Amino acid sequence: MIEFGSDYHLCGEKHIGGNTLFDVFPNVRLYASGRHAFSALLGHHDWKRIWIPAYFCYEVITHIEQLHVTVKLYNDFPNNPNVKQTIESLPTQEGDVLLRVNYFGIDLGAQALDIDIPIIEDHTLGLNSEWAKSSTADWCIASLRKSLPIAIGGMLWSPKQHTLPQSVELANEVVELADKRYEAMSLKTAYLNHQFHKKDVFRNLYIETEQQIETLQVSGLDNRTIEIIAHLNIETWMNAKTANWGTAHR
């Protein structure tokens, strides 16, 4: 058995045609990462505090704290049966915003909430879930590279049709970084096909570029990644991921 890790290889060719992410979510802003989507959204508003589930990516929490917004944590986790009660009892105040997280598309979180502050939802791991597609949140965010076979990418949209932040330009450093990650993805494909045997080569590229993503200035998304998203059948891709999960857990 070949050890191959969790970073995607180039594997979207079998899933071309049909409904794409842009068909499901036609009015979006694209960024180099999910963190950039948070930066753009929080910079677009004057929120003072953001409530974030304690079960969340702490690298992203650290990034948000650097945006001069006070982070408040609340108790939420996958399949939390008490999430509605927990959120509605939070001591929120004017100037707050709440982050909900779609945990793997199987969560109970799509419940209507009786709160008086804006809601952001993170659908990174549930892009094709009914919750994501029928969301009534003020804003939604996703780190696309966590769910799709692409090198980089983040997305922001508003189910309530709020005005989106202005588009940002594509930075040269993002193009260079994406090229490196696509090189790593290509080498990994060759590795899985027994055509390349130096795993450390593409692993080092993944590690190097992962560190670079953390320091990028807010940027738009490169053309190669946009082209992949524009042709990738989101339904067959997500179904394949589900089938892979089932195979791994037999």
What residues fall within each predicted segment?
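Glycine-rich beta-alpha loop elements in corrinoid/cobalamin-binding modules
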Residues: 124, 128-131, 136
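N-terminus-biased targeting/localization segments
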Residues: 1-10
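A conserved donor-nucleotide-binding helix/loop in the catalytic core
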Residues: 37-38, 100-112, 138-157
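PLP-dependent aminotransferase-like
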Residues: 10-28, 32, 36-120, 126-128
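Active-site region of PLP-dependent enzymes
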Residues: 128-129, 139-142, 146-153, 157-249
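A short alpha->loop->secondary-structure connector
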Residues: 120-121, 140
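Short, surface-exposed amphipathic charged segments that create phosphate/polyanion-binding patches used
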Residues: 87-92, 136, 156-157
